[in-house]
Amino acid sequence: MSTIVQRQKEFNFFDLWDSFCAWITSTENRIYIGWFGVLSIPTLLAATTCFVLAFIAAPSVDMDGIREPIMGSLMDGNNLITAAVVPTSAAIGLHFYPIWEAASMDEWLYNGGPYQLIVLHFLIGIWCLLGRFWELSYRLGMRPWIAVAYSAPVIAATSVLLVYPIGQGSFSDGLPLGIAGTFHFMLAFQGDHNILMHPFHMLGVAGVFGGALLSSLHGSLVASTLIRNTDENESINGGYKLGQQQVTYKYLAGHNSFLGRLLIPTFASRNHRAFHFLLAALPTIGIWFAAMGVCSMAFNLNGLNFNHSILDSRGNVIRSDADILNRANIGLSVMHAPNVHNFPLVLSSGQPIPVS
């Protein structure tokens, strides 16, 4: 009796590496990973996990660095509207503050360490997700405009979570991670920088509102000009098959004939590619400008101010809405001050200016 023993295949690291690379970059996977995904997936998971834990159970944080901790978690008595991950303490400033830099876990939590962990992992994750969009588009032979459009919210998040704290000198000035915290950040930003009077913010508003208008216009016109392949007793959606190559609506009927007669011929559109490009470009460019505005105001290049009232030839104040706006900004600024129980000097000095 003889026994035949086959020789085992030797371990080859390079063959294993080639298989791993093919799996990472394969477009046949249910979820595309890609090389950017190797970094974006774990960082976003880490940020999400830490955010959920901090949102539910993080202890109070000394955000202003004056030993007056702020309670932001659900277990401290907040609800879903008021709860937030409180930014890192002003005592830490812009220092990198990982867990191993603190003397204890309690100290790390008290100084708001989770905020830095969440923000930095989140920013790495969303920038790599942008790269992942480009990578998948490249491998499928598509053009890169999906990644370009996604760059707008990524830049906006980076401006309020990283650039603004850098410009102001502390992560404590960053956006709190919560609903009420977001509105607190907006009001404080208006009081300190008068963002509503910044031209870049105005362009951002025009872009977002214009994009919303075009989206509703396009959607309603498409839904109104669907091609019917069924009789009147069946739903018009019954004649549609997923992935069909035939057109499903009449672009010229809605965007050219209808708009051209409803408004003026100049507003009519005959080129659906140009219209779809405008639909994507308008909000994207608008958010780019808004993010650039936040980045400029991070270094105190603020919006247009009206610190000096309009005077007549005799030196008397001419009442205007600018005075009301200026006083409102001053009120927001002093209410944002950490020691608000002390009467602010900015309101106790100078001549009173009646606004009504």
From Swiss-Prot:
UniProt EC number: 1.10.3.9
Residues binding Fe cation, per UniProt: H218, H276
Enzyme class, first EC level, given as a word: oxidoreductase
Binding site for chlorophyll a ChlzD1: H121
Localisation per UniProt entry: Cellular thylakoid membrane
List of residues binding chlorophyll a PD1: H201
Residues bound to [CaMn4O5] cluster: D173, D192, H336
PANTHER family membership: PHOTOSYSTEM II D2 PROTEIN (PTHR33149:SF12), PHOTOSYSTEM II PROTEIN D1 (PTHR33149)
Additional comment: Cyanobacteria usually contain more than 2 copies of the psbA gene.
Name of the featured protein: Photosystem II protein D1 4
Lineage: Bacteria, Bacillati, Cyanobacteriota, Cyanophyceae, Nostocales
